[in-house]
């Protein structure tokens, strides 16, 4: 066999001509320590704060959280068990984004926007940064449209407007999540898209909640973001920002959205865990110094945009769990000072059967009053006064043996109004029904009934108005006011109904 040098030269020449010079420059580092959802890496000299990085061997994503002189502290978004010392980390040159848009409606996702409901992949056309700057004063307009929760005591006394931040605060098992879920259910047909963010909750509780929303037909306009108790602290920390970004898609497209953060106490605990593991200096209650900013930058993203900028709104309902009724602890006081009011739920009221267990004295809405419809304003004004007087007299009446008729009348009215404030879970009411029922309460139509019959009276009155006097409810809904004519019709209808009710059920 003879070797032909000419052929070898030809082959070499063709190979050299076809060679493309490619230099792949990547900023990489090496893992020097890993554990508890945190990794430290050497190298990555040009990485930016909050930039995403990838652990090459496992494909796991992390976020550069601490930039120190000789290493980078990374929070790991996912399972860190496969990551080992000496593994390579590379920069992704982008900050964290999540899929947004209508493709996420009806889905249950994790904080990275990946589906966890087994219904296949999500075809999102758009992505949004998880951390963005809140809209400035110039882009906003005052809150002027109501967000109806369907809960009488809230819509009448602590009204919420679209674009408001209203805190729901109370001990464990006092019905905080129930208020949030009823609010979501009540948005059906009202053009409000909802995002429910579960932070550090039991997966079984979230599954139960999702099935309730499906039953009520509310998942059609709702996205559920879950960072359960089984997920690591990094995912729990990211969750509310991811949920907010999903809600902001609707805000900046001129639509209305509602985001519920359940709950921010566990969020603060997750952030404290990350900060302590990264050796950031602890402050009060071992929380880091910037824990106020942690929540303020999240809640400031809720807004009502001016018409020039689309006129969308993002309403936030953060939830805080207190320990033994202590609303003066660090995180509760922080969030109270950030939000535009709070709904305070009290265990003693809850166990006494007053549900929703809202303490009217400690609850307040700082901007929602401007958003109330005129009809509700008319009935809520005297309702507030009647209940305040009743609560004042109630304590006094326990010690007094004989009461003058005026005091006795106020106590009688107050007891019936408090009974009227009770409401079943998963049964939100339309605002026109609330107006009719409260009108009957404040005008003394319940005063001569037994307290036990108040709820029955309410139920039958709504049925009567829907069946026989639907034009009254329609007028209140359309005019959003209680004109003299409508009021006269409502008065006559209640009187007619009451005489029938007393005949059948007695007083």
UniProtKB/Swiss-Prot annotation:
Binding residue positions for ATP: 170-177
PANTHER family in UniProt: ATP SYNTHASE SUBUNIT ALPHA, MITOCHONDRIAL
Lipid bilayer topology: Peripheral membrane protein
Pfam family, one: ATP-synt_ab
Role summary: Produces ATP from ADP in the presence of a proton gradient across the membrane. The alpha chain is a regulatory subunit.
InterPro entries: ATP_synth_asu-like_sf, ATP_synth_asu_C, ATP_synth_asu_C_sf, ATP_synth_F1_a_nt-bd_dom, ATP_synth_F1_asu, ATPase_a/bsu_AS, ATPase_F1/V1/A1_a/bsu_N, ATPase_F1/V1/A1_a/bsu_N_sf
TM spans (from-to): none
Keywords: ATP synthesis, ATP-binding, Cell inner membrane, Cell membrane, CF(1), Hydrogen ion transport, Ion transport, Membrane, Nucleotide-binding, Translocase, Transport
Protein name (record): ATP synthase subunit alpha
Localisation: Cell inner membrane
GO-annotated cellular components: plasma membrane; proton-transporting ATP synthase complex
Family the UniProt entry places it in: Belongs to the ATPase alpha/beta chains family.
Subunit description: F-type ATPases have 2 components, CF(1) - the catalytic core - and CF(0) - the membrane proton channel. CF(1) has five subunits: alpha(3), beta(3), gamma(1), delta(1), epsilon(1). CF(0) has three main subunits: a(1), b(2) and c(9-12). The alpha and beta chains form an alternating ring which encloses part of the gamma chain. CF(1) is attached to CF(0) by a central stalk formed by the gamma and epsilon chains, while a peripheral stalk is formed by the delta and b chains.
Tagged with keyword Lyase: no
Source species taxonomy: Bacteria, Thermotogati, Thermotogota, Thermotogae, Thermotogales
Catalytic activity as recorded in UniProt: ATP + H2O + 4 H(+)(in) = ADP + phosphate + 5 H(+)(out)
EC number: 7.1.2.2
Residues carrying the site annotation Required for activity: 363
Any one GO molecular-function label of the UniProt entry: ADP binding
């Amino acid at each position: 066999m003879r070797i032909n040098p000419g052929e070898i030269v030809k082959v070499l020449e063709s190979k050299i001509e076809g060679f493309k010079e490619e230099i792949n420059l990547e900023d990489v580092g090496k893992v020097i320590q890993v554990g508890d959802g945190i990794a430290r890496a050497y190298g990555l000299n040009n990485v930016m704060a909050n930039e995403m990085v990838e652990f090459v061997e496992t494909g796991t994503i992390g976020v550069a959280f601490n930039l120190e002189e000789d290493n980078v502290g990374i929070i790991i978004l996912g399972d860190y068990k496969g990551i080992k010392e000496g593994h390579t980390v590379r920069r992704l040159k982008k900050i964290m984004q999540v899929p947004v848009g209508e493709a996420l409606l009806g889905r249950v996702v994790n904080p990275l926007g990946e589906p966890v409901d087994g219904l296949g992949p999500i075809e999102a056309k758009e992505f949004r940064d998880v951390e963005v700057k809140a809209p400035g004063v110039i882009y906003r307009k005052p809150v002027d449209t109501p967000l109806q929760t369907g809960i009488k005591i809230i819509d009448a006394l602590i009204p919420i407007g679209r674009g408001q931040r209203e805190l729901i605060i109370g001990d464990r098992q006092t019905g905080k999540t129930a208020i949030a879920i009823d609010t979501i259910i009540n948005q059906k047909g009202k053009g409000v898209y909802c995002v429910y963010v579960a932070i550090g909750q039991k997966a079984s509780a979230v599954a139960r909640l999702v099935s309730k929303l499906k039953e009520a037909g509310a998942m059609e306009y709702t996205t559920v973001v879950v960072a359960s108790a089984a997920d690591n602290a990094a995912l729990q920390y990211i969750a509310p920002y991811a949920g907010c970004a999903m809600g902001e898609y609707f805000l900046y497209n001129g639509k209305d959205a509602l985001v519920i953060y359940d709950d921010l106490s566990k969020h603060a605990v997750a952030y404290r865990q990350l900060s302590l593991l990264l050796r950031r200096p602890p402050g009060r209650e071992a929380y880091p110094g910037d824990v106020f900013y942690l929540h303020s930058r999240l809640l400031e993203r809720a807004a009502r945009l001016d018409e020039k900028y689309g006129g969308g709104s993002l309403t936030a309902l953060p939830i805080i769990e207190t320990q033994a009724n202590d609303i003066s602890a660090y995180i509760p006081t922080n969030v109270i000072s950030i939000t535009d009011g709070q709904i305070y739920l009290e265990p003693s009221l809850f166990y006494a059967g007053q549900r929703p267990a809202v303490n009217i004295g400690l609850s307040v809405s700082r901007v929602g009053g401007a958003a109330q419809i005129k009809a509700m304003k008319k009935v809520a004004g005297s309702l507030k006064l009647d209940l305040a007087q009743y609560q004042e007299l109630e304590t006094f009446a326990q010690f007094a043996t004989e009461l003058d008729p005026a005091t006795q009348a106020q106590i009688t009215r107050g007891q019936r109004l408090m009974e009227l404030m009770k409401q079943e879970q998963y049964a939100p009411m339309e605002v026109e029904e609330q107006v009719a029922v409260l009108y009957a309460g404040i005008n003394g139509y319940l005063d001569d009934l037994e307290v036990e019959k108040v709820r029955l009276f309410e139920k039958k009155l709504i049925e009567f108005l829907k069946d026989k006097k639907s034009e009254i409810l329609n007028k209140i809904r359309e005019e959003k006011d209680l004109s003299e004519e409508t009021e006269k019709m409502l008065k006559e209808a209640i009187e007619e109904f009451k005489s029938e009710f007393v005949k059948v059920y007695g007083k």
